[in-house]
């Protein structure tokens, strides 16, 4: 049977009992090694991925998995991690193995070694990996007869022994899982002798030659199993793809992402910094960054007012009891900063006259918003009640995961909590999702999909019935939006299911943006009520919603999305006057005054630098509009536009230039201005 290769392929194929999956794939005429869509594993009827060497006991229908799919790439990367580990133990025989899973766009492996790996070490390891790949070693699955056999074989690998004993634990550990303990041996293709092996549940590609293209990218320190109380290991990262072309494309993307890194641009553009004296994950915004942040907030504030939100403010710290009531201290304590014990009073001899109490920095604003709702009686006529706050919160993130503005310890959420009746819930969710998508679009993000996070069976509060009702409401609204919906089983917070709006940036990377979370639980815990139309007391439904997620994170994402070249309406400096010579400065200052009268953020560069150097500097600073003026411009009452793409419009009457800039900013154009896009009449 031959299966045509189409966008929807591969169709299921049959593997006869006693036959390898590889033979069935070959008989079906599906692509083999060397093709980007080569079949690397198959998926059986239970959803389990199987090696191509798998032989079913009875006839089985399987779905071939191609190398150029997410699942196929994951298998290739997992196999590449094994090749890396083999190379490390050959070149560094004292190395002890940690874990080596595939990750998004790549893989890593952790090693216990005496010294950190150097760039030269990575070059040597990559060279040895290429030799192993060229050898075509076979990946061979082997089942341990018992834990005792596994322990005996792995006696020299302490981290693997820990995984053997924790076999039923973490499902994300690639080494163990399922009903069996298994190893994968790398076999010499000629002699079939074992060359190297690793504790692993698989699956793997047939041979090392099925790794078409790979590269080691970097190394770093990492704690064993991500716990800072455990041993510090050395982690080597790499990436592997279905073709050299795909690898090259990915490496170019990495290079571009590094160029756009918001931490790098934040320093180069004088936007923000992270002083050591303040602490990890705590940013300070410089004047220019403060302008961008203010514009982000002010536009959002205006839109929220138009949409019927009421603004509130709450303190940064609160008594511990509030977080006992909310459940945060039961379910979220690890993400909170330690308590401050305050208000105790003592006699002169040290005897406690008045006991103190614990206060916490708030990790979330929602408990305080419930208190605002509860501060007086509420009627159904007041609902939906939409409370909104730019509220600064503090979360204890481990230092190893803090990452610039996108993963911080202190940040400001654009936090809203909506209280409505159950009858209003569906309509409120639908209008809320529309509002979120429209507002994100105003900032230039337009490529979205949705993620539905559902209950973690081991970490939730409230009844199953409440969770089911909330999940159904969110799923219905998501379906009505027409956007792709990706399930996230068990990914919800402890108090309710949520929809996350995922946005793709200019590089195609996905970022979690807005979250919309239904909560029947908080109204119960805080005993929130309203008087219904029939006079009875009813519980409202609560919706948690953060549109940006946090101002800081959104700032970082937009910085990378625009590569620092913010739209003119957000740019810290919207226009700059660049004189040909000093005598042209007064004229440009008069043009700047005209622009300032319209609210434009404009500067005139009166420095001693030559004009060409000024243009280079302000181009690097991503100023949207550069206005040049020399003798002819002054005589004609004109300016010349210069843009970041090096295009230019000469001899534009100053009033026309001012009008064009003011209109561009007022229209909130998100594209980069250029001679092609800016509509002005030239005086020449």
Swiss-Prot record:
Root EC class? ligase
Q: Where is the TGS domain?
A: 1-66
Give GO cellular component annotations, separated by semicolons: cytoplasm
The family classification in the record reads: Belongs to the class-II aminoacyl-tRNA synthetase family.
Principal localisation = cytoplasm
Q: How does it assemble?
A: Homodimer.
The record's remark on the cofactor is: Binds 1 zinc ion per subunit.
Q: Where in the cell is it found?
A: Cytoplasm
**Under which EC number(s) is this enzyme classified?**
6.1.1.3
The molecular function GO annotations come to: ATP binding; metal ion binding; threonine-tRNA ligase activity; tRNA binding
* Annotated Zn(2+) binding sites: 366, 417, 544
Which transformation does this protein catalyse, written as a reaction? Answer: tRNA(Thr) + L-threonine + ATP = L-threonyl-tRNA(Thr) + AMP + diphosphate + H(+)
What does this chain do? Answer: Catalyzes the attachment of threonine to tRNA(Thr) in a two-step reaction: L-threonine is first activated by ATP to form Thr-AMP and then transferred to the acceptor end of tRNA(Thr). Also edits incorrectly charged L-seryl-tRNA(Thr).
Among Pfam families, the record links this protein to: HGTP_anticodon, tRNA-synt_2b, tRNA_SAD
The source organism is: Mycobacterium avium (strain 104)
Q: Spell out the CDD domains in the cross-references.
A: ThrRS_anticodon, ThrRS_core
Using the UniProt annotation, give all residue ranges assigned to the region (Catalytic).
261-567
**InterPro entries referenced in this protein's UniProt entry, alphabetically:** aa-tRNA-synt_IIb (IPR002314), aa-tRNA-synth_II (IPR006195), aa-tRNA-synth_II/BPL/LPL (IPR045864), Anticodon-bd (IPR004154), Anticodon-bd_dom_sf (IPR036621), TGS (IPR004095), Thr-tRNA-ligase_IIa (IPR002320), Thr/Ala-tRNA-synth_IIc_edit (IPR018163)
Which BP terms does GO give this entry? threonyl-tRNA aminoacylation
Which keywords accompany this UniProt record? Aminoacyl-tRNA synthetase, ATP-binding, Cytoplasm, Ligase, Metal-binding, Nucleotide-binding, Protein biosynthesis, RNA-binding, tRNA-binding, Zinc
Which co-factor is required?
A: Zn(2+)
What protein name applies here?
Threonine--tRNA ligase
């Amino acid at each position: 049977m031959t299966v045509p290769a189409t966008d929807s392929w591969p169709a299921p194929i049959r593997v006869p009992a006693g036959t390898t999956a590889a033979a069935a794939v070959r008989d079906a005429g599906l692509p083999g090694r060397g093709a980007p869509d080569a079949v690397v594993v198959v998926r059986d009827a239970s959803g389990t991925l199987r090696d191509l060497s798998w032989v079913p006991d009875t006839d089985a229908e399987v779905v071939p998995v191609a190398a150029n799919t997410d699942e196929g790439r994951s298998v290739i990367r997992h196999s590449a991690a094994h090749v890396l580990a083999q190379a490390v133990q050959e070149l560094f025989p004292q190395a002890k193995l940690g874990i080596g899973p595939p990750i998004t766009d790549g893989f890593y492996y952790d090693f216990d070694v005496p010294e950190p790996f150097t760039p030269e070490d990575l070059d040597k390891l990559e060279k040895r990996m290429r030799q192993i790949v060229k050898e075509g070693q076979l990946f061979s699955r082997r089942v341990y007869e018992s834990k005792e056999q596994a322990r005996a074989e792995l006696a020299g690998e302490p981290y693997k022994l820990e995984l053997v004993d924790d076999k039923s634990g973490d499902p994300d550990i690639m080494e163990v899982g399922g009903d069996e303990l298994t190893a994968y041996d790398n076999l010499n293709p000629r002699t079939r002798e074992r060359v190297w092996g690793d504790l692993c549940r698989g699956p793997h590609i047939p041979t090392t030659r099925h790794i078409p293209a790979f590269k080691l990218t970097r190394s770093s320190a990492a704690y064993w199993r991500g716990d800072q109380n455990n041993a510090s290991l050395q982690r080597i990262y790499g990436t592997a793809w279905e073709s050299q072309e795909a690898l090259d494309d990915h490496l170019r993307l990495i290079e571009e992402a590094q160029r756009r890194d918001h931490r790098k641009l934040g320093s180069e553009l004088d936007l923000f910094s992270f002083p050591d004296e303040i602490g990890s994950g705590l940013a300070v915004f410089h004047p220019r960054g403060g302008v961008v942040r203010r514009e982000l907030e002010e536009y959002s504030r205006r839109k929220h007012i138009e949409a019927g939100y009421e603004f509130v403010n709450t303190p940064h710290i609160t008594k511990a009891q509030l977080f006992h009531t909310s459940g945060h201290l039961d379910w979220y304590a690890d993400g909170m900063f330690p308590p401050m014990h305050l208000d105790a009073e003592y006699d002169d001899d040290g005897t406690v006259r008045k006991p103190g109490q614990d206060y916490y920095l708030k990790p979330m604003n929602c408990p305080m918003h419930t208190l605002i709702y509860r501060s007086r009686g509420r009627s159904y006529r007041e609902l939906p009640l939409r409370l909104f706050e730019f509220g600064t919160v503090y979360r204890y993130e481990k230092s190893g995961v803090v990452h610039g503005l996108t993963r911080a310890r202190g940040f400001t959420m654009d936090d809203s909590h909506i209280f409505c009746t159950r009858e209003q819930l569906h309509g409120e969710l639908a209008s809320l999702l529309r509002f979120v998508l429209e507002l994100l679009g105003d900032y230039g993000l337009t490529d979205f999909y949705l993620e539905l996070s559902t209950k973690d069976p081991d970490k939730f509060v409230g009844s199953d019935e409440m969770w089911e009702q909330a999940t159904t409401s969110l799923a219905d609204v998501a379906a009505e939006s027409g956007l792709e919906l990706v399930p996230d089983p068990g990914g919800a917070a402890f108090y309710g299911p949520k929809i996350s709006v995922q946005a793709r940036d200019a590089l195609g990377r996905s970022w979690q943006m807005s979250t919309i979370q239904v909560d029947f639980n908080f109204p119960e815990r805080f005993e929130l009520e309203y008087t219904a139309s029939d006079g009875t007391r009813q519980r409202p439904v609560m919706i948690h919603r953060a549109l940006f997620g946090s101002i800081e994170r959104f700032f970082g994402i937009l910085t990378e999305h625009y590569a620092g070249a913010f739209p003119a309406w957000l740019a810290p400096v919207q226009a700059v006057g660049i004189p040909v010579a000093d005598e042209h400065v007064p004229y440009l200052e008069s043009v700047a005054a005209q622009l300032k009268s319209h609210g434009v953020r404009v500067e005139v560069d009166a420095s001693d630098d030559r004009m060409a150097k000024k243009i280079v500097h302000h181009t690097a600073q991503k100023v949207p509009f550069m206005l040049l003026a020399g003798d002819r411009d002054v005589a004609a009452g004109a300016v010349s536009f210069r843009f970041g793409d090096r295009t230019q419009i000469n001899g534009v009457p100053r009033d026309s230039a001012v009008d064009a800039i003011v209109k561009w900013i007022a229209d909130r154009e998100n594209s980069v201005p250029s001679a092609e896009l800016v509509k002005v009449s030239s005086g020449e």
